[in-house]
């Protein structure tokens, strides 16, 4: 079975993949064997991954709040993730 691309996977899987890649980048940078240019490229990629992870966590928090608001249980609804098309 072919591996799904990042855009075809679930938000949780994308979060986990982004976090794993971010951790690998941090390890490479901590070793100190990267050139300045490689370090800058890794840093830029890391910032993008961090932002992706932060957004995924915010969406997860919103989903939990929508599903578990004790003050308004009648408003609990299934979460529909945003379209990845645009």
UniProtKB/Swiss-Prot annotation:
EC numbers, comma separated: 3.1.11.6
Q: Which domain of life is it from?
A: Bacteria
One GO biological process term: DNA catabolic process
Q: Which Pfam families match?
A: Exonuc_VII_S
Q: Which InterPro entries match?
A: Exonuc_VII_S, Exonuc_VII_ssu_sf
The record's annotation in SUPFAM superfamilies points to: XseB-like (SSF116842)
Question: What is the protein's major site of localization?
Answer: cytoplasm
Q: Which UniProt keywords apply?
A: Cytoplasm, Exonuclease, Hydrolase, Nuclease
Q: What is this protein called?
A: Exodeoxyribonuclease 7 small subunit
Tell me what organism the protein belongs to: Xanthomonas oryzae pv. oryzae (strain KACC10331 / KXO85)
Please name the taxonomic classification of the source. Bacteria, Pseudomonadati, Pseudomonadota, Gammaproteobacteria, Lysobacterales
């Amino acid at each position: 079975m072919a591996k799904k691309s990042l855009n075809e996977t679930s938000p949780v899987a994308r979060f986990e993949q982004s976090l794993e890649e971010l951790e690998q980048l941090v390890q490479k940078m901590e070793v100190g064997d990267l050139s300045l240019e490689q370090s800058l490229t890794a840093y830029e990629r890391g910032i993008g991954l961090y932002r992706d992870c932060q957004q995924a966590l915010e969406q997860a928090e919103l989903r939990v709040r929508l599903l578990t608001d004790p003050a308004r249980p009648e408003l609990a609804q299934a979460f529909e993730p945003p379209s990845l098309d645009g």
